[in-house]
């Protein structure tokens, strides 16, 4: 869908750009010549309305030429600078909430062509802890957003009971791994969020996330716990469901590695959601190739209070600002 929109935007910009050039370099000089001839023939100065009647500009040409600068600016900004995205799910809570509208820095990981997403100019690579928008490897039409936890060459081990990550850099190409990266965790505390569980009439299970004061409860809800996770020099909060256990049988098992251990190949990344028990991420479907990277999430520019798949019920202006 995103690539289709980009294709339509590129085509519209090219078509209106051609109209703008044709008008500027072909039709406009002819109109000016006819207007000058009319001025000479009348012997008096003609006003603009009269001159426009003498040499009118076709409506379709005027519309196309006037739209071109706007489309060109939108194309440049959206393709190479910043693109807006909406957060549709709770997988990155508490950092990003359902209903957040974010700005993604498109040039953070390379300047890419807007249609095929081929890198034209390399500008950088994800750093550990970056919040990254990328094309889902199993269906590139979908945009995902997760946190970059593992970089190329990292050995990632996830403890599904303690829900903690161990990272050993420099493990690719059969080399001996370097010392483990300092990954620290604060004490587990109750969070402000409650996850509710219910079933629709058809039997389909549904879930929602709500901010609920610590001294209150919510029907069919479980209060999530949280702690701070520090990956090197990046600290952020993660959420956990106290009673949840990962479905290890659904983990992506890398050939040659034990379950829940992965060595990130060159040019690929290991992504995880901050809402650890509510995130389908690299633990389940593997690595993200560098070619799939879209950009780095840098700011929230608007936020609506809403649940997944429902209409907004309010505006959260306090969330507008940078993302960490």
From Swiss-Prot:
Organism this protein belongs to: Salmonella typhimurium (strain LT2 / SGSC1412 / ATCC 700720)
Cytoplasmic side: 23-58
Protein name: Signal peptidase I
Compartments in which it is found: Cell inner membrane
A single GO molecular function term of this UniProt record: serine-type endopeptidase activity
GO CC annotation, single: plasma membrane
Main location: membrane
Classification via PROSITE patterns: SPASE_I_1, SPASE_I_2, SPASE_I_3
One GO process term, biological-process aspect: signal peptide processing
Periplasmic face residues: 1-3, 78-324
Topology of this chain in the membrane: Multi-pass membrane protein
Gene: lepB
SUPFAM superfamilies xref list: LexA/Signal peptidase
PANTHER family xref list: CHLOROPLAST PROCESSING PEPTIDASE, SIGNAL PEPTIDASE I
Signal peptide start-end: none
One Pfam family from the record: Peptidase_S26
Regions that span the bilayer: 4-22, 59-77
Principal EC category: hydrolase
Keywords, comma-separated and alphabetical: Cell inner membrane, Cell membrane, Hydrolase, Membrane, Protease, Transmembrane, Transmembrane helix
Catalytically driven reaction(s): Cleavage of hydrophobic, N-terminal signal or leader sequences from secreted and periplasmic proteins
Similarity comment text for this entry: Belongs to the peptidase S26 family.
EC number per UniProt: 3.4.21.89
